[in-house]
Amino acid sequence: MPRSRINGNFIDKTFSIVANILLQIIPTTSGEKRAFTYYRDGMLAQSEGNYAEALQNYYEAMRLEIDPYDRSYILYNIGLIHTSNGEHTKALEYYFRALERNPFLPQAFNNMAVICHYRGEQAILQGDSEIAEAWFDQAAEYWKQAIALTPGNYIEAQNWLKITKRFEFE
């Protein structure tokens, strides 16, 4: 039984019902429908913290999905799971792959910046200020890209960029 049919909470049930209706009314191939079903089940598993199950569903969705835009969101979600698991190198790889297919994902740029900023903080704790500055500079570049795509968002990042004099805003 697909995961979407066994969820108990109202939001998950509502999402599943809407997704199933969309699958029926939008003209798509059976492969696209199967890919979306795996993607949807991956999102539900991810929202419940079942990351191994979510990854299995996302990998299957990737195998079936041919649209680069849709694949970008699958890759982004895989990156989120690796971020949650502390696997930052893998997460960065998946965010990069998502952005190759869809360069208009500000949330991917933001998450990459957060990882770089975290690595900069870790370098400071290890006493390596030169490496820390390189990580912070990289974080700044990613945040600038995220902010350029969605100027009203990422206020904390904008403040950090101003405070550290890495970016001037009008």
Curated annotation (Swiss-Prot):
Keywords: Chloroplast, Membrane, Photosynthesis, Plastid, Repeat, Thylakoid, TPR repeat. One of its GO terms (cellular component) is chloroplast thylakoid membrane. One of its GO terms (biological process) is photosystem I assembly. Coiled coil: none annotated. TPR repeats lie at residues 35-68, 72-105, 120-153. It is a peripheral membrane protein. InterPro entries: PSI_Ycf3_assembly (IPR022818), TPR-like_helical_dom_sf (IPR011990), TPR_rpt (IPR019734), Ycf3/AcsC/BcsC/TPR_MFPF (IPR051685). It is found in: Plastid, Chloroplast thylakoid membrane. Its main location: plastid. SMART domains: TPR. NCBIfam families: PRK02603.1 (NF002725). Belongs to the Ycf3 family. Essential for the assembly of the photosystem I (PSI) complex. May act as a chaperone-like factor to guide the assembly of the PSI subunits. This is Photosystem I assembly protein Ycf3. It comes from Zea mays.
